[in-house]
Amino acid sequence: MPKIEGQIMELTTETIRFIEENARADVRSLALQAKKYPQVDMAMAVVQIAGRQIAEAKVPTWYHTEGLLYPKHLSMEQCSSEATAIYKASLVEGDTFADLTGGFGIDCSFMSRKFRQADYVERQAELCELAKHNFPLLGLDIDVHHEDGVEYLKQMNPVDVLFLDPARRDGHGGKTVAISDCEPDVSALEDLLVEKAQKVLVKLSPMLDLSLALKDLKHVCEVHIVSTDNECKELLLILQKMPVQSEISIHCINSLGATNGYRIYQEYTFTQEQERTSDCPLTHEVEAYLYEPNASILKAGAYRSLTQAYPVKKLHPSSHLYVSPHYIEDFPGRKFQVEAVSGFGKKDLKTFLQGMEKANLTIRNFPSSVADLRKRLKLKEGGEDYLFATTLADESKVLIKCKKASSLL
């Protein structure tokens, strides 16, 4: 059995049975019942049950692998999902690979399959022991090193690909906007990183200021902004020593789940030069279809170039909503059919909202919060109607009623 923080982790038959029988139970409730089950290591059981519950949705491949052990709650919450790990694996290949910030090992487990030799480096002893236990069960032959990633980097032999997932070091969970707020500090290590690997893949928080990151780092050749079901999850930077093209390609990815075992992605790629130089047609006419770019595109700031890639017009420079007279099936974001448009006069709203008790409300460039506007409109959350409160190119404020376009076709 692996050693965890100096103690032998022994899962007795009773504890294993308890974990299996309580797979769906509320772990907070179970933790209070330890005295009722003296033969069960309740502390360990609760950790394993909670880990499995998170893994079922987040990392199904791991969930369906028997015998895996899970770490404490924080490590599970912070680890990558299977969808984002699979995407990262699609960006790398070669002979040798090293993960300098191993963590729970999910990213390493998916990327390592693309290499002959893989090394996992982690300074927390517990996570190293879990990796030693779990990797063989996943059919992986990965060398585990209980060591600080920066120290390992200094003495390691060069590899084809290096991976880092710097952690926030603000100590209180506050908003992080700069690479220097993370540990290890990639900006301080950049020259050494590109000396040690042909390609360096860096995973950063989506809260990071992308423009600032590109100013801080001189070897970035690609940016990948990854969302899952329209929630921005990761900012990935690919660094290479030579050559670095003058224009960095920015890839906006939105994972929409899997069909028949194949993962479905929305993808939109552009450069900052394309964004700067693109004409952006504006309109104050709300046409038949309305589009909201996915979270990755909004994070990337690809507002103008979208109008060149797709036959759409923007409702306002700051609204980030687009319209077209005809349906554009492959637009990378949410797509709606417009049913009605209203101003905010009392009579207009009364007619517009007649018979409507609930709706999904979104604010875009509008002087109110969702909560305040929902209260004003006296609408509950949910239903099949979608309302967008926004500002048009002529500065008029409107409420746009829509239905999801995909459900109508």
Regions found by a protein language model. Give the residues of each.
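SAM-dependent transferase fold signal centered on methyltransferase-like domains
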Residues: 1-409
